[in-house]
Design a protein with these regions (language model features):
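Bacterial N-terminal signal peptides
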Residues: 15-27
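Residue-identity detector for glycine
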Residues: 12-14, 98
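Feature of secretome-associated and extracellular-like proteins
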Residues: 1-3, 18, 159, 166
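Compositionally biased, low-complexity repeat tracts
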Residues: 8-10, 29, 152
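N-terminal secretory signal peptides that target proteins for export/translocation
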Residues: 1-11
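OB-fold and OB-like single-stranded nucleic-acid-recognition modules
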Residues: 32-185
């Protein structure tokens, strides 16, 4: 009578644990690769006053900037320029929609450094949004901004770090890995 032990018993609990950990280590980068989609209120710490925007359904793309502006309603309530930031977001891979305010443009006409803001006209009009509603972004590839009314998705690793430009103070920084036009789902 030839009885074979099941593979799990031959390896022992330590070896099984090691195999399981190795499998998780191989799968983890797949999970880590998807950025966490944020909206602008997520950049405001808990306890700060928030007013829920009254969103109406969009019937055409001309209402897109109004929809993004409504998402950013809590920005007007935050103290500037040293508005508190959400420390837990530091180092997270995120995806955030917003409008580009160019700071640096390459010779090829690509914006390589900019502020990402929650609504069109922010930082152009006074006062600018609070620091926790502005992300200072640097991009090696840059983006050709043909229309300042066009919102964009920006993906990258968010850093909780203060920076200052001639237009505004920002509470967050990011090196953009992807930049593409925001479109309604």
């Amino acid at each position: 009578m030839n009885r074979r032990m099941p593979p799990a018993k031959r390896l022992g609990p330590g070896a099984l644990t090691l195999i399981l950990l190795l499998m998780l280590a191989l799968i983890a980068p797949v999970w880590a690769g998807e950025p966490r989609e944020l909206d602008w209120p997520a950049l405001i710490p808990e306890g700060a006053p928030i007013i829920e925007p009254q969103m109406a359904p969009l019937h055409d793309l001309s209402q897109l900037s109004d929809a993004l502006s409504a998402e950013s309603a809590p920005a007007a309530l935050q103290p500037a320029p040293n508005a508190p930031v959400v420390q837990a977001l530091d180092g997270q891979m995120i995806k955030l929609p917003g409008y580009i305010v160019p700071l640096e443009v390459s010779e090829e006409g690509r914006t390589t450094e900019f502020l990402l803001v929650p609504y069109y006209g922010a930082c152009i009009h006074v006062p600018p949004p609070p620091a926790n509603q502005i992300v200072h972004i640097v991009s090696e590839m840059g983006v050709r901004v043909e229309d300042l009314y066009q919102p964009y998705w920006i993906e990258g690793t968010l850093k909780v770090a203060h920076s200052s430009s001639e237009l505004a103070e920002s509470g967050y920084q990011m090196e953009a890995e992807k930049i593409y036009a925001y479109e309604l789902k």
